[in-house]
Amino acid sequence: MNILSVASEVYPLVKTGGLADVVGALPSALLPHGVRTRTLVPGYPSVLKKLKKKKPVGRFDNLFGHPATVLAAEVNGVDLLVLDQPALYARDGGPYLDSTGRDYPDNFRRFAALSLAAAEIAGNGIIPNWKPDIVHVHDWQTALTPVYMRFGPAPDLPTVMTIHNIAFQGQFGASVFPELALPPDAFSTQFVEYYGDVGFLKGGLQTASAITTVSPSYAQEILTPEFGMGLDGLLSSRVADLTGIVNGIDGETWDPQTDPHIPAHYGPGTLKRRAGNRKALEERFGLEKGPGPIFCVISRLTWQKGMDLVAEAADDIVALGGKLVVLGSGDPALESALMAAASRNRGHIGMVTGYDEPLSHLMQAGADAILIPSRFEPCGLTQLYGLRYGCVPVVARTGGLTDTIIDANEAALSAKCATGFHFLPVTTDGLRLAIRRVLRAYNEPKLWARLQYQGMKSDVSWAKSAERYVSLYSALLAKG
C-alpha cells in the first residue's frame, strides 16, 4: 500500500510543534505493515539546506504563476518529496510567519500550491512510476488537497484528513477564491465557502473520505460548540467518518537510555541516575541546589496552553518548596508575566524563551514533573515524552491528556497503574490543588518512584496507533 502524506512541516527538517513530530514518526511505524509513505512538504530554505542528496523527480511549468520542481530525498528514514518553488517558500522567516512574527499575506497561495501539487501527484503521474493508493493530509495547510482532487485529477482516490488542532482553520476572505484555481462550483457550502469566506480546513472536512483527529476524547469534544470552533455541525453530520487515534512518539529520538542531549542515561530500573540530569538542569537555569521537586513547562506560551495559570501559580510552587523551569515563547504578556515570576524568585524559577530541542530533552530528564494545564489539547506529545523520561505529567482533564495519563487517584494507586495527575476545573486554583497533590506524592519516595516507573513502562510508541491507521486505510480501499 502506498500513501502520500502531505504536511507543512516534518521533523527533523522543520518543526514549530507536534505536527512535525507526528508526520516524521508515523511512516516508520506503518512500514512493518507493508505501508510505504512518501511525505510531501514545502521547500523552505531550512528544508533544502538539510537535504544532502536530492534529485528532481517531477516538474510543474506553472504552479500558481511560477515553475516548481518536486525533489525526492530521504532523511532519518522518511521518504520525502519536497516542493521547491522559491517564489512561495524562499522566505527569511519561519514556515508561516515572517521575521516580525506576522502571517505571510500570501499564506493562502503558498498552501493552496502545496495542496494542488499533492492532487496532481496523486492523479496525474507527476512522479514517474509511482502513484499513491491513499492521500493523507494534515491540518488546514493541506486541506484543499481533497478539494482539488474532487474537481480534478483523482476524484475517486481515497483521502484522509487529520485534524491536529481545530483552532487553526485557514480562513481567508472571499477575494482570494479566484486565485485558487478551483471552479466556481467550489465556492459553496458543500466545499470551501464558510460564512462568506474561504475555509481551507472546512473544505477538507467536507470532501475527505475519512476524518481523523489525534485522540478519542478530542474526537468527541469537537462535536460540541465549546470545542468545535464553528465546525461542530459539519463534523456531527460526518460523525460516522470521524475517528480519534492517539499519537505516539519516536522511541529512538526520545529514549533516556541513549539520548545524546542528556549527561546521565537511565531506564525504568535505574531512576537514581536521573540525579545527574537534575544537576545539569539546575546549572542550566541557575537554580539553587536543594530538595523539593522541579516542575517544568515546555510549551507555546498561550492562553490555550493555560500558561496564564502557570504564571499565577508560580509563586505558590516556590512557597510550597518546589522549583520551576520554563521553555517557550508566544504571547508577549504571558512571556512577561513568567519572566517577572522568575525575577521575583531567582534561584527557584528559571526561564528560557524560544524553543531549544536539546534543552527540552534535558528538562524531561532532569525535572520531576511536567505541567500541562491546557484548556483544550487535541492529543499532546509533551506528556508522552514525560512518561518516557520519568517526568510525571500534571495535566488538565481534557482531550488527549485524559486519554494518555492515568490519574493517581486511590483506585489507580491501588491497582498500580497511575502515571500522573489530572485536575479539573482548569483554573489557577485547580492547578494549585494539583501541585499540592504532586508535593504530597513526591514526599513519599516509594510512591513517587512507582509513579515514574509505571509511566516509563507505558507503551507510548506508535505501534498500536499505526495498526489503527492501517485498519482505516484498508477499510477505505475495501470500499473501492
Curated annotation (Swiss-Prot):
Record-linked Pfam families: Glyco_transf_5, Glycos_transf_1
One Gene Ontology CC term in the entry: cytosol
Membrane spanning residue stretches: none
A biological-process GO annotation: glycogen biosynthetic process
Gene Ontology molecular function, alphabetical: alpha-1,4-glucan glucosyltransferase (ADP-glucose donor) activity; alpha-1,4-glucan glucosyltransferase (UDP-glucose donor) activity
Similarity remark: Belongs to the glycosyltransferase 1 family. Bacterial/plant glycogen synthase subfamily.
Keywords attached to this entry: Glycogen biosynthesis, Glycosyltransferase, Transferase
Name of the molecule in the record: Glycogen synthase 1
Family annotation (NCBIfam families): glgA (TIGR02095), PRK00654.1-2 (NF001899)
Gene3D superfamilies documented for this protein: Glycogen Phosphorylase B (3.40.50.2000)
